[in-house]
From Swiss-Prot:
Subcellular location: Cytoplasm
Species assigned in the record: Helicobacter pylori (strain ATCC 700392 / 26695)
UniProt xrefs under Gene3D superfamilies: Arginyl tRNA synthetase N-terminal domain, HUPs, Isoleucyl-tRNA Synthetase, Domain 1
Name of this protein: Arginine--tRNA ligase
Gene that encodes it: argS
Cellular component GO terms, alphabetical: cytoplasm
Length: 541
């Protein structure tokens, strides 16, 4: 509806028009502040301009039957949609069913490469990884729903010093807990019960001869063994959140193409040698300083691997590349973009979204750390505690780039203080009414909407506004808008439900038809959030 109204107004006024929702629902369904901009051009008051435009719009042939009223108010132009228009849009939504909200013009379709999570396979996924994981998965769902082509990839950092350290940590745990030797651990190593688990499992799975080689060979064997086990566990953790990737890219495999990439950087005059190191001239592209790619010992930095990986990605020529990183990687953006420019790519095609920290509470106290993983809260522990749907909803309920703190006990409450419960409860109420109704679903669907009051019309309008919520969520990377939409719609429905009996009125079929649209919109919104909406739920509020 929003796109349609905007298009009609722009055609009539021959100006770009901002169409927004009024702060006060009594002012109508939509509003535009265009008169404020035009007032400066025509040197008239915004109210005078608004009155002229309101008359022009209301009398134009393209708006006949579209609006009940077009009113100038304090410089704004407020629009109230006609019931006839809402009825036509309702029929279209009911015909689209689970596709309602997916309308997108084919020429706007994009090919998107979405990389997220990409946690090192050196330990189980913790709660900090979950936020970016859930966001990326839902962003992909929304993008595909809108007609875009999306590839979701997990970049596996399966080489380098952290993988060797994993193997060393397992080897030391093996010596201590299997061979019962006295062991001195280094200052930095991976700790936690999972390391001991891997060591004991290696004792059962690996050929005994492999663990009797020289220490460097043993560490190499255990590095690969532990890495593979961790990657399997990571996939299980993601599965518990309902997340599945289209592909997993191995850093070890990708880095085999490093020579060609470095040759290209050399040709672009992007490298120089200083202090026995090879540097990237990233400061030429807004980076704070140049960056080391090859260290004195001839080993490569993490950045070198990232550059080779991004070269592999950009060779595939997607419309847009989206990376979801932890907020602590903010400084990496400029250096990666610099490398893309040196390699001849358009770095503006890369968008990096940063996920801020998560702080979990339970009974207003910090959530207990996992003994298995050391100083982390594991995804699996929280999913087992509150369920994947509640966890997904709360992670998506705030902007990705803002800090998130919540008490998991809120997600266990069966009352209006628990937002996901309250949305489920709205849908449950609708399905209970439909079961109790003497009318068949077909009767309800075929009933024309002819006799709705202002509140009923507004509830219908809110339910039909799902497409705008979906579009805004994607375009602004603001998935919290989907959560806000679902919460607001559920709240409006509960107010409507509590205001009076629905089944015992002459227009019961009309009201049930509104309820069907509300249920459809809530269901479609939740599906895009990766949540299955419930049709049966108990209530204690």
């Amino acid at each position: 509806m929003h796109t349609l109204i905007k298009g009609i107004l722009e055609e009539i006024l021959e100006e770009e028009v901002i169409v927004e929702y009024p702060k006060d629902r009594e002012h109508g369904h939509y509003a535009t502040p265009i008169a404020f901009n035009l007032a400066k051009v025509f040197k008239k008051s915004p109210l005078a301009i608004a009155e002229e435009l309101a008359l022009k719009i209301s009398t134009h042939e393209k708006t006949q039957g579209l609006f009940d009223s077009v009113v100038a108010c304090k410089g704004y132009i407020n629009f109230t949609l006609s019931l006839d228009f809402l009825e036509r849009f309702t029929q279209k939504a009911l015909e689209l069913k689970e596709k309602f909200g997916s309308q997108v013009k084919s020429e706007r379709s994009q090919k998107i490469f979405l990389e997220f999570v990409s946690a090192n396979p050196t330990g189980p996924l913790h709660i900090g990884h979950a936020r970016g994981a859930v966001f990326g998965d839902s962003l992909a769902k929304i993008a595909r729903f809108l007609g875009h082509e999306v590839l979701c990839e997990y970049y596996v950092n399966d080489m380098g010093s952290q993988i060797r350290l994993l193997g060393l940590s397992v080897w030391l745990a093996y010596r201590e807990h299997v061979l019962k030797e006295s062991v001195t651990y280094p200052e930095v190593f991976y700790k936690g019960e999972y390391i001991i688990e891997i060591a004991k499992k290696a004792n059962n799975d690996l050929e005994p001869s492999l663990l009797k080689e020289n220490e460097e060979t043993i560490i190499e064997v255990l590095s690969g063994y532990a890495r593979d086990l961790m990657l399997l566990e990571i996939k299980d953790n993601l599965d518990a959140l309902g997340i599945h990737f289209d592909s997993y890219a191995s850093e070890k495999e990708v880095f085999k193409h490093k020579d060609a990439v470095f040759e290209q950087l050399e040709k672009a005059n992007a490298l120089y040698e200083k202090d026995s190191k090879i540097w990237l001239k990233s400061s030429l592209y807004q980076d704070e300083s140049d960056r080391v790619l090859i260290k004195e010992d001839k080993s490569y930095t993490y950045l070198a691997g990232d550059i080779v990986y991004h070269d592999e990605k950009f060779k595939q020529d997607y419309t847009k590349y989206i990376n979801i990183w932890g907020a602590d990687h903010h400084g990496y953006i400029a250096r990666v973009k610099a490398s893309l420019e040196f390699l001849g790519y358009d770095s503006n095609k890369l968008e990096v979204l940063l996920a801020q920290m998560v702080r979990l509470l339970k009974d207003n106290e910090p959530y207990k750390m996992s003994k298995r993983a050391g100083n982390f809260i594991l995804i699996k522990d929280v999913v087992d505690d509150v369920g994947k749907d509640a966890l997904r909803f709360i992670f998506l309920s705030k902007r990705l780039d803002t800090h998130l703190e919540f008490d998991v006990n809120t997600l266990k409450k069966q009352d209006s203080s628990n937002p996901i419960y309250y949305i489920h409860y709205a849908n449950s109420r609708i399905h209970t009414m439909l079961e109790k109704s003497p009318f068949s679903k077909e009767e309800v669907l075929q009933t024309p909407l002819t006799n709705l009051n202002a509140e009923e019309k507004y509830l219908l309008f809110s339910a039909l506004s799902l497409p705008k919520a979906i579009e805004s969520s994607f375009e602004e990377y603001g998935l919290q808008k989907m959560c806000e939409y679902a919460k607001t719609l559920a709240s409006e429905f509960h107010r409507f439900y509590n205001a009076g009996k629905i089944l015992d009125t002459p227009k019961a079929k009309e009201l049930l038809k509104i309820c069907l649209i509300v249920s459809l919109s809530l269901s479609n919104a939740f599906k895009l959030l990766g949540i299955e909406i419930k049709t049966k739920i108990s209530a204690r509020d």
